[in-house]
Amino acid sequence: MGNKCSRSKVKEPKRKDIDELAERENLKKQSEEIIEEKPEEVVEQVEETHEEPLEQEQELDEQKIEEEEEEPEQVPKEEIDYATQENKSFEEKHLEDLERSNSDIYSESQKFDNASDKLETGTQLTLSTEATGAVQQITKLSEPAHEESIYFTYRSVTPCDMNKLDETAKVFSRRCGCDLGERHDENACKICRKIDLSDTPLLS
């Protein structure tokens, strides 16, 4: 029913194979005929023909081996020295770059630390006095009831930046109690966003 297995098929010889087989058979017949006529001479000729290519192959192999052994010795020393110098110079450049970057980072961090220490000592006092005044005014606007203060500790958290307090910024918004400085964004302010502006007059 099914197709025959293609693996079990014996391959038919191609035309070239047929020609080669015919030539081999002819050579065998000729050699047998010659051997029957003059067996001693034929044996000597066959041995000589077999020995000659073997000797030639051995000589060629020996020459190749000798050439391969001589090749590594012929590499000029100048090329080796140049390659090692390139490697050293590349490594030295890489190390110098690393040292520079590390020293730059270290010096910048030192500058930053020194500057931050100065800022902390000098400006902390001014910020604390200005901020306490602002916090006192904010707490007056939104002071919790007496009962709530017992249960909750009051923290004054303003969504706006309190670092820039100048004379014009000390005017507080009626909507959220934040300072109306340059950094006050009413769209980003959590308190300003929740206030309904439909009833309030426009602020100038």
UniProtKB/Swiss-Prot annotation:
Mutagenesis / variant outcome for changing S103A: Severe reduction in GAP45 phosphorylation levels. Further reduction in GAP45 phosphorylation levels. Loss of phosphorylation by PKB. Reduces phosphorylation by CDPK1
Modification after translation (UniProt): Phosphorylated at multiple sites. Phosphorylation increases during the schizont stage and peaks in segmented merozoites. May be phosphorylated by PKB. In schizonts, phosphorylated at Ser-89 and Ser-149 in response to phospholipase C-mediated calcium release. Phosphorylation at Ser-149 begins in early schizonts while phosphorylation at Ser-103 begins in late schizonts. Phosphorylation at Ser-89, Ser-103 and Ser-149 appears to be dispensable for GAP45 inner membrane complex localization or GAP45 inclusion in the glideosome complex. N-myristoylated by NMT. N-myristoylation may contribute to the targeting of GAP45 to the inner membrane complex with the subsequent palmitoylation strengthening the interaction with the membrane.
Keywords carried by this UniProt record: Lipoprotein, Membrane, Myristate, Palmitate, Phosphoprotein
Protein's UniProt keywords contain Lipoprotein: yes
Record carries keyword Phosphoprotein: yes
Bias type Acidic residues, positions: 54-73
UniProt-annotated stretches for the region Targets GAP45 to the cell membrane: 2-29
Localization per record: Inner membrane complex
Consequence of gene loss (knockout): Schizonts develop at the same rate as wild type parasites and are morphologically normal at the end of cycle 0. However, proliferation is impaired during the subsequent cycle. Expression levels of MyoA and MTIP are severely reduced. Expression levels and subcellular location of GAP50 is not affected. No visible defects in intracellular membrane complex development or morphology in the intracellular merozoites. No defect in parasite egress from host erythrocytes.
Biased composition (Basic and acidic residues): 9-53
Modified residues (Phosphoserine): S89, S103, S149
Location, primary (coarse class): membrane
Transmembrane segments annotated in the record for this chain: none
A GO cellular-component term linked to this record: extrinsic component of membrane
Membrane topology classification: Lipid-anchor
Lipid attachment locations (N-myristoyl glycine): G2
Effect of T84A: No effect on GAP45 phosphorylation levels
Coiled-coil region: none
Chain residue ranges for the region called Disordered: 1-86
Subunit structure: Component of the glideosome complex composed of GAP50, GAP45, MTIP and MyoA; the complex is formed during the late schizont stage and in merozoites. MyoA, MTIP and GAP45 probably form an initial complex in the cytoplasm which is then recruited to the outer face of the inner membrane complex via the interaction with GAP50. Interacts with GAP50; the interaction is independent of GAP45 phosphorylation status and can also occur independently of the formation of the glideosome complex.
Record function comment: Component of the glideosome complex, an inner membrane complex structure involved in parasite gliding motility and host cell invasion. During the asexual blood stage, required in schizonts to recruit MTIP and MyoA to the inner membrane complex where they assemble with GAP50 to form the glideosome complex. By regulating the formation of the glideosome, plays an essential role during merozoite invasion of host erythrocytes.
Name recorded for this polypeptide: Glideosome-associated protein 45
Native organism: Plasmodium falciparum (isolate 3D7)
